[in-house]
Amino acid sequence: MAHFNECAHLIEGVDKAQNEYWDILGDEKDPLQVMLDMQRFLQIRLANVREYCYHPDKLETAGDVVSWMREQKDCIDDEFRELLTSLGEMSRGEKEASAVWKKWKARYIEAQEKRIDEMSPEDQLEIKFELVDIFHFVLNMFVGLGMNAEEIFKLYYLKNKHILNVKIMDIKQKFYRTYIVKVRTPKGVFWYAGKHESFIVNPYNDKYPGSGKILWNIYRKYGFNYKIRWSKCHGSREKSYEVERELISALKRKHPDTCINISPGGQGGEGRKWTEQQRLEHKLRLNNPETKTRMKNSQRIAQNRAERKARQSEVMKKFYSNGGNKKISEGTSRAQRKAPHWHEPLKSEIHELWVSLGKPATGPVVKALKGKYDVTSSALKNLIYLFRKEDV
């Protein structure tokens, strides 16, 4: 039986565990696979130290696997008894706690009727730790068969789909979450907090980068160099708004100079609204001759910076180094100079294709012609316009 204090002290590393979990999701890794790898490593290390322990990668025969599985089942049975005892409040001591399942104990009825939510946080945590101890040996069973997280999910999904005849993706539930974005720029690190609603179970599969106006200006200028941390689901829109306000308030206290939230949160942000007086003052500043001269000079300097020219040159070299890009670019320019330039029977062929696609814009037509005719949307623009005009 694990003693109460031995498990309780583990909570001291909860921040590290939380950060590790966020990092795993942020790196698009599977937490279950990480746990399987950890458990496999632990068993390999144990086998290397104690030769009488099984090595999970050396289970070759059915007999080896039977022995391995039986060991895990024995360990699970032992941990299950500890789990039951922990439900009697381990802070009372193991002997008193066992009254929850020992009917001959005087405290049996009292222990049986005790509500879980009335137990101390430490006792509730102890129960969860005991369940995790069982999970160690369940993981070992998967490791012994060489199964990974993807295979476990697929087989679990197929098994339940067959039994219940339901599809997980058909269950439409909206999730109300809050998040914190940490975005890195050449000017430093900035923070943003917000709220998001989606039907996606795992928010890290959402690819949602936040919605703040300043945040998106940063993305447009410096790219999507950010990390996002999601909260659990709050259950309702109202609760998520409440938590959003608390998050923004906390960020502004902790990072007063680098928190880029404009609004305090709660109902979404429309940005900072100017008064009529502020609008007038801004208009006067923009029309000031000195301001115009300063802006013009700044623009000229920016356009002539060596770094900017080098970057533009690199982009164009990369574009024209690809023969296909060069061909398309030259073809587009020629089409724009000489349009309309389509002749029969090609014109009729494209018209039939355009009609069969439901008379769309240029994009779908370009995709349909790919491989047969290398054209761009710009080259087709005038032709599609002509088709629409003739249909009227």
UniProtKB/Swiss-Prot annotation:
Sorted UniProt keywords: DNA replication
CDD domains according to UniProt: GIY-YIG_SegABCDEFG
Entry function: May play a role in viral DNA replication. Found associated with a viral DNA origin of replication and with host membranes, may attach this origin to the bacterial envelope to initiate replication.
Gene responsible for this protein: 69
Keyword Cytoplasm part of the UniProt annotation: no
Keyword Ion transport recorded: no
Name of this protein: DNA replication protein
Domain of life: Viruses
Stretches the record annotates as Disordered: 322-341
Gene Ontology biological process: DNA replication
Organism: Enterobacteria phage T4
